[in-house]
Amino acid sequence: MLRELGRTATVKAHGRSVLRPVRGPAGRRQVAFTGVRPSVRVFAEAPAAEQAAKAIKLEDVKEGSEYEGTVTTVEEFGAFVNFGANTNGLVHISKLASGFTKNAKDVVQPGQKVTVKVLSVDAEKKRVSLELKSAVAAEASAEESDDIITEPDREGADATDDDEDVEVELEDGQVEVRADLPGFEDIPFVMEEADMDAEMSEAAIAALEADLDGAEIRYELEAPAYMEEVTGKVARIEDYGVFLEFEWNGKTLTGLLAKDEMKVPSSALSAEAQAALRAEWADTGFEMPAFVELPDDELDVKKYYQPGESVPAFVLESSLVDGRGISLTHFTDEEVSAEAVAAYEELEDDEDEELDKMMADAAGLEDEVLAFDPEALMEEDEGEEAGAAADAGDDAEYEGVSADGLEGANGNYALGATRSGLIKGKNGYQVAPMGLPSRPLNDAVTSSGLAILGTSEVDFDGDEVQLVDYWTSEAFDNIPKDVLKKLGLKMSYTEAGEAEFEERADFEATDVPFYLYGGDVESRAKEFVADLLSDDVDEAELPARAGRAPIVLAAAVQNISAAEVKALREKTGAGMMDCKKALAECAGDAEAAAEWLRKKGLSGADKKAGRIAAEGAVARYIHPGSRLGVLLEVNCETDFVAASEKFQALVNELGMIIAATDCICVSPEDVPEEVLAKEREVEMGKEDLANKPEAIRAKIVEGRLQKMRDQVALTNQATLSNPDKTVAELVKETIAAVGENVKIRRFIKYRLGEGLEKKANDFAAEVAQQTQAKAAAPAAPKKEEPKKEEPKKATVAVSAGTVKELRDKTGAGMMDCKKALAENENDMEKATEWLRMKGLAGADKKAGRIAAEGVVASYIHPGSRLGVLLEVNCETDFVAASEKFNELVNYIAMGIVAGQNVQYVSADEIPAEVFEREKQLEMARDDLKGKPDAIRAKIAEGRAKKIATEMCLLDQPFLTDPSKTVAEAIKESIAAIGEKISVRRFVKFQLGEGLEKKSNDFAAEVAAATGAK
């Protein structure tokens, strides 16, 4: 299935259409093209019968039988004959005549009536071998000619602007092709028969074998095509656009109508605005449009669109383009091109002298496409012949849709890679509505391939134009002479018709603009233009929609090197024209230009830094080994940017930078005052400053403190991807790239066992202590009373199988299991309880040990809006790496997220003032005012304790078993593992917690603006 191109494409082919490249007739204005045609028809030289006879089953065909049939095609090895069966039979060249036959075409012709005899039938493989018995004289269905069709002179073709229909005479081995588009059915194309070893499509094979007038294959496409009109209901409204749900081909699809691509209903405007608009359109003779464009500062998406409303739109992009779903627009290509060209025309004359000169040079090339790839001509190594250079373009790789993506056919369905172009037509320079191939395509084009060629297009002013066929034109036919001159090359043709290139003697190298002459125009121009547009109204930037016309936009910045403008834009986030002006003012010095922009207040990143950023992500980085962990929150303005690859890459790198450095705060201004006071005291007491005057000493200390601030601030750390760049610069570049304010809000770092005292074994001290204990005089023995003898329990026989069963159930030791069974007379349940009680008693003993090993772990809730970092300790790294321990840690982390009010590990950590504040709040409640003070105090204290319990992690229900608390679950793990386990600390970040989100009150803004006037 042709994926996500949007329409249902129909391909019809005849038996003679073993397809080769298409050549358009002369006398048509040529423009570039890319896209998918709804349908293409391929006609035969002689049409078949209007109604095919009922097919004979192969099982009914008997050897020796004779049939009348029609020759469908003639090959070197013989002829295919349709004799009424559902499979065409083959008459081998040796069976065409009684004598020797050199050429099958000398005996039979396509369409000729013949009588054949069946030699053999293979129903399983659907093969029938025939012998020619007799043949009716062939009718002259097509004129035979050995003349060579020559292409008209190129310059003459360019100067021709005649749109009259062209009569096309078919030669032997040719077919006629017409576009199945309303109004363009009369435009003919000539197709030549492929070589004998050319690969045939399934459609052509079906037609060859069945002699059908048209073998029709339909491809059901998954998404609407470019600029197809759809109407959907508003499903969701955001500040950056609306999501429309619409029905297409029986499916419900969702597309984003972005704010930059949006118009508003004229009916939603104020009465005054509607009256002015109606008066404006009254002079044109047309009705007032249903949708109108508003300036960005007046466009409030939520004001003009409501959920459930029906909204029409055009399809701008589908997932085939960039994998981001369906994008919608209210602007046609005509409007976009007009905006881009108008923006170029508004540039000052002295700013684009070089571009104007190029345009003037191109003006002499009537109807010529100005986007191509002549650098491919010079990619060969020196010393190679020019003829080899001519083949370089043909052998280049091209992108396409593989046969796996098609349904019902296995032919060659190559889609040529295409790019945008700037054309010169009747109405001046315009962006080509479609595009042209990056390189000529040498492969044979099949019937399916025709669906992407098409034959004609309509330019922005409704003029019909003929399409360039880059699949069959010679590699160098479409290179203007002035371009070769600019490149220092001269082209000529050898006697064999091969192109030769030689350098001009008087050539002087000049800076050739990259967008027009170098490399793949579309990819380079789009890459250059991608970040040039700014949504800041006060920067007077080119319109955002003009990004669909990258050639025109790229043209607007050619005086200054495009690479320099792009680099400065990425670094500062300033507008395109501002960057160009800054480089011009600073003689191309990028550093000076960046400083110039900053002083002028034109840095886009600096402007965006003032916006409220309450969206973003809570992320974590756990260093391998789980001994170091980081939890951080990075904010942006919208969840759309938060989910972008660029933003996520920034967050991930920040986490690793925090782990790798000694930073303790985000910026130098965030260093805690107590840390500065302590450092100031230390510096003032150093001996190297003792003999200096107080004022000088204070100044030196402040300088050292500032250096310390810079060292511990995250924004001043070097990035991992580029050590020459700081984190602050990386954030600024991200702001410029995503177009939103990005801010590092907070982070925290845990290092395992930090501040804990590990147990140290001093064996010498232990031996000395034991020696002193032995040397001490023994105390007088107490007189013990005789113990009462208890009757001995009868010995219980315990089987090995029972011991194994209990051991598997509890995990206890073998001797412990045996003793438990003996004590409980082989009762499995009682023995299990006995072991549990014994184990918990052991756990209480282990609680006094020092636990300085363990893990630093984290849990990020899906959506990256809530995250937890915690440290859980045990006694040995062996246990810390065990599966049971890590499973416990993960459940505890998820439990912290689940408990909304969890703030402390245990009740002992709750500050006294917090408990007292909660108690006073409860005392002041209305339901306790009528009670005596003593009773009220007791009730308030009970409620405060309950609140305190809700704040403590250890008192929360355990995630997997709410019948027990986290403390009880830890105690059971201690009994099972055999080491002390303790939750040392944790921290929880919730995205945007405490931040104020921006709310747009347009009524208040309008009132304020009116009052200001």
Curated annotation (Swiss-Prot):
SMART domains registered for this protein in UniProt: S1 (SM00316)
Location of the region described as Disordered in the Swiss-Prot/TrEMBL record: 141-163, 772-798
GO cellular component, one term: chloroplast
Alphabetical UniProt keywords: Chloroplast, Elongation factor, Plastid, Protein biosynthesis, Repeat, Transit peptide
Compositionally biased tracts (Basic and acidic residues): 781-793
Acidic residues composition-biased segments: 141-150
Main location class: plastid
Ranges for domain S1 motif: 64-133, 227-331
Localization (cell): Plastid, Chloroplast
One Gene Ontology MF term: mRNA binding
UniProt KW Transcription keyword: no
Feature: transit peptide: 1-43
InterPro entries in UniProt: EF-Ts_dimer_sf, NA-bd_OB-fold, S1_domain, Transl_elong_EFTs/EF1B, Transl_elong_EFTs/EF1B_dimer, Transl_elong_Ts_CS, UBA-like_sf
GO biological process, one term: mitochondrial translational elongation
Superkingdom of source: Eukaryota
NCBIfam families with a match to the protein in the record: tsf (TIGR00116)
Protein name as it appears in the record: Polyprotein of EF-Ts, chloroplastic
